[in-house]
Amino acid sequence: LYQNEEVRQKNMPLLKRCNDDPTIAFMTFKPYFHNESFPFIEERTQEYFGCGRISRQDADKFAANTLHIYEYFVAPVFKRGLFLGFDQRSREKIGEPYGWIRTARDQREVSQQDFYKHCEIVLQPTDTTENWPRVGFEAMASGSVLVVDNRGGWRQMVEHGKTGWLCSNERDFIYYASKMACEPNLRDDMAEAARARG
């Protein structure tokens, strides 16, 4: 039983070599998500452009170039970042976040709902391949546009250019984050499309 088709296709041949019994069925399932826990946020402050990333406390959940990406994307107003799930291991990997990026260890410091209320975009480069990321469901329900890696479960969850952005390299992350900061009408349209898809 697999969470997404890409992982099923990758692992099925390997497992069939271990046991080629034709009665074994390799299946995927449609996960359940409780949308009411993450209400859609139509209006966010215009005083700054809110961006962030959220995960459990694990250094691998951060790409080594995370701070470079956050620093170099442009916005017409001040940027305000929020890293939820940030601890000493994360700091040792990526360095000390800039003064405009707030860090929180876990949801006791900043709730998930407050995180999404802050974020126009979830700018989430990682060094892991996500299988079927819960963050995607939460962001899409909340109206935070996803700017994520072009691999793993993100490919099935995000429709590139319509419900979010799939990034293959550092330049993609910087470009699409900048695009979302500078094109609020497109960002709003994408947030609505993601909400409908989710």
Predicted regions and their residues:
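Short glycine/acidic-rich beta->alpha loop that forms part of the nucleotide-sugar donor binding site
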Residues: 129-133, 140, 150
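Conserved acidic donor-binding segment of nucleotide-sugar-dependent glycosyltransferases
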Residues: 160-171, 179-184
